[in-house]
């Protein structure tokens, strides 16, 4: 069963900039501390990454996974689903962007199921840490480029 986490933050940058940074998957290793590799395998008709391969640090290990992105709710949000992963059975999520003048409210929802035998508390903590760290890193990247 997947554990879920949701969090939101306010970023001192316009929504268009936040969205552009969040969609530039191949640059994730430059600003997302846990992401070591992000490689776009397929693009949609608009040039956006539709299937992306990642290697990241998680749970004290190097994990590999492939996500498929859905842009049906753009420009307000985009979502993803796990296609393949070595330590995860599920990793489905969504970023939602709400413009508030020169600032943006960003919501991140994640459902993750780890394929390792871990106590429930650790699994829930892992989901929360992923969401929290991702939003902190995204905020820093967006505010640094404004």
What are these regions (language model features)?
Residues 6, 106-107:
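Hydrophobic residues on conserved beta-strands that form the core of alpha/beta folds
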Residues 35, 44-48, 78, 95, ...:
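Alpha-helix boundary/capping detector
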């Amino acid at each position: 069963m997947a554990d879920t986490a949701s969090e939101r933050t306010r970023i001192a940058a316009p929504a268009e900039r936040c969205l552009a940074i969040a969609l530039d998957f191949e640059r994730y290793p430059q600003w997302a501390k846990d992401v070591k590799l992000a490689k776009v395998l397929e693009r949609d008709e608009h040039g956006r990454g539709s299937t992306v391969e990642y290697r990241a640090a998680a749970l004290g290990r190097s994990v590999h996974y492939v996500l498929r992105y859905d842009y049906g709710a753009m420009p307000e949000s985009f979502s993803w689903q796990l296609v393949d992963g070595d330590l995860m059975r599920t990793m489905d999520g969504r970023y939602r962007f709400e413009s508030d003048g020169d600032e943006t409210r960003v919501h991140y929802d994640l459902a993750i199921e780890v394929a390792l035998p871990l106590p429930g508390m650790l699994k829930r903590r892992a989901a929360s840490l992923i969401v929290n760290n991702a939003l902190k890193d995204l905020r820093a990247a967006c505010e640094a480029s404004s």
